[in-house]
């Protein structure tokens, strides 16, 4: 696990962009993408660059169950607004949150992941150590599944909604086993509130209680932090 500690989010996002572009130059064709605040700076670098992604494929980690793609709080909408409208990809896949047939959604997404193995996966990390929507206790060999979100995750995401009561309680997510199949993983984390979790991920016991600790088992992970998120690392 390679750790890059940067001065701030701006520098971190630039470093992530440069790493991603290097992977693409070296042949990466399928990008695993994340939502939330952590990758926003990276997406801003991508959209403001001259880079062309129209021959690449993107596969997103997750989506809320029950939200249509046109819902402003859906991850479909997030990705369209922050990246795809400015930088289209050849194909972009996101779980269909409007489809309440979980078996159908899960089987379809697992087929996509089998057809298009991910070269570079972008990740954020939750305060409880979740990656994607893989909450504590998720098996490390898990594939795509429907998850019931913990109160901690719902409260953390409430800032994007009118209130915590409006946050969906379930999501479709790629599993930890799916994430670990990526050839290169780039994880971004910022702020003092992530410091304890980052330390557990990097230096702690490998345990399902901290889903991101599974990344210790992966041979090619780059963790990009600001000084605050890195403040608890030895």
From Swiss-Prot:
GO terms for molecular function: glucosamine-6-phosphate deaminase activity; identical protein binding. It comes from the Bacteria. It is an enzyme of class 3 (hydrolase). The active site is at residues 62, 128, 130, 135. Its EC number is 3.5.99.6. HAMAP family: GlcN6P_deamin (MF_01241). This is Glucosamine-6-phosphate deaminase. It comes from Limosilactobacillus reuteri (strain DSM 20016) (Lactobacillus reuteri). The gene is nagB.
């Amino acid at each position: 696990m390679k750790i890059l500690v940067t001065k701030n989010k701006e520098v971190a996002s630039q470093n992530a962009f440069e790493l991603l572009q290097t992977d693409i130059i070296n042949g990466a064709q399928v990008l695993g993408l994340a939502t939330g605040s952590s990758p926003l700076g990276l997406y801003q670098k991508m959209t403001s660059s001259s880079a062309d992604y129209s021959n690449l494929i993107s596969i997103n980690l997750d989506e809320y169950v029950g939200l249509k793609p046109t819902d402003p709080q859906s991850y479909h909408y997030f990705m369209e607004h922050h990246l795809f409208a400015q930088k289209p990809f050849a194909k972009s896949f996101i779980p269909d949150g409007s489809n309440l047939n979980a078996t159908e959604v899960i089987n379809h997404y697992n087929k996509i992941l089998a057809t298009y193995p991910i070269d570079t996966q972008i990740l954020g990390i939750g305060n409880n150590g979740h990656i994607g929507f893989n909450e504590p206790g998720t098996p490390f060999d898990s594939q795509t599944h429907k998850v019931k979100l913990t109160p901690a995750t719902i409260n953390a995401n409430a800032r994007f909604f009118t209130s915590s009561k409006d946050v969906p309680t379930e999501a479709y997510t790629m599993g930890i086993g799916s994430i670990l199949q990526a050839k290169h993983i780039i994880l971004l984390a910022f702020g003092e509130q992530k410091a304890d979790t980052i330390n557990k991920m990097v230096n702690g016991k490998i345990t399902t209680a901290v889903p991101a600790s599974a990344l210790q088992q992966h041979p090619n992970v780059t963790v990009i932090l600001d000084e605050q998120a890195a403040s608890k690392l030895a």
